[in-house]
Amino acid sequence: MSEQQNQQTAALGTAPVGPLLFRLALPTITAQVVNLLYSIVDRIYIGRIPLEGKLALTGMGVTFPVITLISAFAALIGMGGAPRASIALGAKENDRAERILGTCTAALWALALVLTALFLLFQAPLLKLFGASADTLPYAMQYLNLYVLGTVFVMTSLGLNGFITAQGRSSVAMKTVVIGAVLNTALDPLFIFVLKMGVRGAAVATIISQAVSAAWVLRFLTGKQTVLRLKRAYFRIDRPLLASAVGLGASPFVMQSTESLLTIAFNVSLQRYGGDAAVGAMTILTSVAQMVQLPLTGLAQGAQPILSYACGAKRPDRMKRVVQLNLAAAFVFAFSIWAAVQLFPHTVVHLFTSDEELVERTVWALRVYFALGFTNAFQTGFQQSFVALGEARISLFLALERKVFLLIPFILILPHFFADKLFAVFLAEPVADLLAAATTTTLFLLRFRQITRDM
């Protein structure tokens, strides 16, 4: 390892927390914002396909559970392995960190092949289960048929990018996402409109973009500039290391995989009470929610290597400072977006559709659904901090609590207590937000105080 690389890694434990958090979080936030373009740009263009944009947009929304599940499996291994590698670096165990990287890479690729085969075989019944109607199923299948062929590229770019951030190279990690998202933005109109491929064109553009992102990640992790190098000798599944990574990655996996269950619950209930138009509105609401969630995740990812390194080095004062700054920045951002959405909902919705009937229904739903959206700052900030500290069990519980224990039951139960069934379905979101934020904040403050006191 070069002297410069040693200095870059050591900075995680010595540089002033404020400037370091800004330096690491800005690229990861930028990466998440740009990553948002992958899905949002597709939706914006698809929603404007002549004559069929409304149904095509709704059909694409039905594919979200599959797309989310692929990302969740990447997180299971990648977001579990990267903090483990960062903790190993903090403890000066560089060889162990590289073995973690090799194990996670082998596992990601094996899992990608399995998922590709399963989704190709069972996509039609799955999409019907997820809320597709006879009108929207053809559009959903057109997109998903091609998208799943790029599963290995998604697993590589999403699953391994955290290992770049884990060594303090968040600017390189940012480029992984920027390269793919910019390319996707450029290719979408070409394939959708110029080549007249419609929904299929959006899928092709996404696959090409993800392949380029994956190539960028592999080029860096096998090159000379990396502290954690992907070595052929370590390219095998070490079961104890994989179990350790999966144990920690279970929380982000549950966070994302339960998003699939959540989408199914929403889609099925909305299809029952409002038809395709209500499902189409939910597609837009999901996009707006991602505008808040993904940057918050990027901020937490920027803070993770600093917090993990400080934990490994047993620096409680530094750990407290990281958590304080992370939470303050998260709240300011989340509150700002919440205010903008509540004040200018028509402007936000018009980004995705020009269909006035869909616009009006979505604006009404958005104000209800996003009523307490700013509480995501507490949920994401504290839950991801538990991941950085290696607290797998608590993080997993918090990941399950909001969606599985609160939100999904509320989606199914609340309509029985309201005359306006659609209102009740959308109301489930802010009710769950309030309860989850209170629980997450309380648990983190209690456990974090204990961890730092015992050091």
Task: Give, region by region, the residue ranges found by the protein language model.
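Short alpha-helical transmembrane segments in multi-pass integral membrane proteins
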Residues: 1-28, 85-152, 194-250, 307-372, ...
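Residue-level signal for short hydrophobic patches within transmembrane helices
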Residues: 18-37, 41, 66-73, 110, ...
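Transmembrane helical elements of multi-pass membrane transporters/channels
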Residues: 23-42, 146, 180, 209-213, ...
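Alpha-helical transmembrane segments and their lipid-water interface positions
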Residues: 31, 35, 39-46, 71-78, ...
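Helix-terminus/linker motif at the lipid-water interface of multi-pass membrane proteins
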Residues: 33, 37-58, 127-134, 190-197, ...
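Small-residue hotspots at the loop-to-helix junctions and early N-terminal turns
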Residues: 54-65, 140-144, 203, 276-291, ...
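Small-residue-rich hydrophobic transmembrane alpha-helices
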Residues: 57-117, 154-173, 279-339, 343-345, ...
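Short runs within selected transmembrane alpha-helices of multi-pass transporters and secretion channels
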Residues: 147-165, 176-181, 202-215, 297-300, ...
